[in-house]
Amino acid sequence: MAPIAVTLLTGFLGAGKTTLLRHILNEQHGFKIAVIENEFGEVSVDDQLIGDRATQIKTLTNGCICCTRSNELEDALLDLLDSRDRGEIEFDRLVIECTGMADTGPIIQTFFSHQVLCERYLLDGVIALVDAVHADQQMDQFTIAQSQVGYADRILLTKTDVAGDTEKLRERLARINARAPIYTVIHGDIDLSQLFNTSGFMLEEKVVSATPRFHFVAEKQNDVSSIVVELDYPVDISEVSRVMENLLLSFAEQLMRYKGMLWIDGEPNRLLFQGVQRLYSADWDRPWGDETPHSTLVFIGIQLPEEEIRAAFAGLRR
């Protein structure tokens, strides 16, 4: 049985998550999507089920499933599986709305720390909605607003129709998260394919930083930022493992997400890795072939010691 793809929908208070969810829950888009949201909105309901753990599940007229929880996320996820396995509901994708002040890290780790959830669900990606009108002020005042951007695989910029010029905001978002592309969404109307198949938590060959890349100093320094490390020389696998272990020992609480492609000395294949806080994985990818071997690593975190991280990898040069 193929695992169920999961998309996390994050964003600060007022960013437009509810508007986007209303679009998902009401449009005739043909997807079989289950949505875990904080509160039910005005949606057309065909049926209502009460799960074993007080998880309220509603089947909607467009075939989507709407689920609200008065308990832990883990229990709600298990309730959905139970209802699906009993044939009471049918869905092949899950979208989870995170609260406006939610820390995305522990929610991500839920899908890697529970055996059943790890087997039955596949975390596809994190989508962050950003209010173009108020984002700068929110990110200045609340580190959590920056963190939501830092964890994202894709960023959806909302309210651009009333915000005016967003170029500086886009530059700031790119400094926080160098790997997430930025899209514009107006009133929640978006091609749902932009929400899905990000492969954000899969080991894949596409490890690049967003373009253009900015090198000027921001007027206000972000607490959350991204560091892109590029190496044009091979590294020893045991030495790079030591560097990563030391980074995790020292800065695991600050590291949010990291992803990379490594040129390992003496190996014809590329080594891919990705991680969230203390959890990470690595695997061999395809041969380099005609591509010039190199290493690219992207670290996103809170007040990361950039000089120390760069020096640690520079020390791998032989």
Located regions from the model:
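Structural motif
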Residues: 86, 118, 144-147, 219
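Charged, alpha-helix-enriched surfaces in structured cytosolic catalytic cores
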Residues: 4, 15, 19, 68-75, ...
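C-terminal accessory "lid"/substrate-recognition subdomains
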Residues: 147-289, 302-318
